[in-house]
From Swiss-Prot:
This is Myosin light polypeptide 6. Myosin is a hexamer of 2 heavy chains and 4 light chains. It comes from the Eukaryota. GO terms for biological process: actomyosin structure organization; myofibril assembly. The modification N-acetylcysteine is found at C2. Residues 7-42, 84-119, 119-151 form the EF-hand domain. One of its GO terms (molecular function) is calcium ion binding. PROSITE patterns: EF_HAND_2. One of its GO terms (cellular component) is actomyosin. Keywords: Acetylation, Motor protein, Muscle protein, Myosin, Repeat. Regulatory light chain of myosin. Does not bind calcium. The keyword Acetylation applies. Coiled coil: none annotated.
Amino acid sequence: MCDFSEEQTAEFKEAFQLFDRTGDGKILYSQCGDVMRALGQNPTNAEVMKVLGNPKSDEMNLKTLKFEQFLPMMQTIAKNKDQGCFEDYVEGLRVFDKEGNGTVMGAEIRHVLVTLGEKMTEEEVEQLVAGHEDSNGCINYEELVRMVLSG
């Protein structure tokens, strides 16, 4: 069925179960990408939607999937090697480093994360940057990327 070891499959199942809020062995479609990201993958929202069969937005919080359905989706995402690395993300943020000192304004990074590319909600951004701003409102983007990639 898949190329994962028994140990990996057990780890995936454990993470899957942490997202199973009702204990019925299922997660919502809307949680699929979160489980994958918790397991070290970095799929775009578009990639997650594709492996889910491109459901309508109102189905995301209604439809569910079992672990047996999730595993082949995880395999598809894991095979995608174009997920970016530390240097890619740092380079992307360096564009906003006007002073060339390894920091970006917190307000600017918030704006970028809610408006460009894989848009995040304001709540997600606040959760992400919490505790990373210095007294001048700047964020060390290398530290931020390191924290995000470490899970």
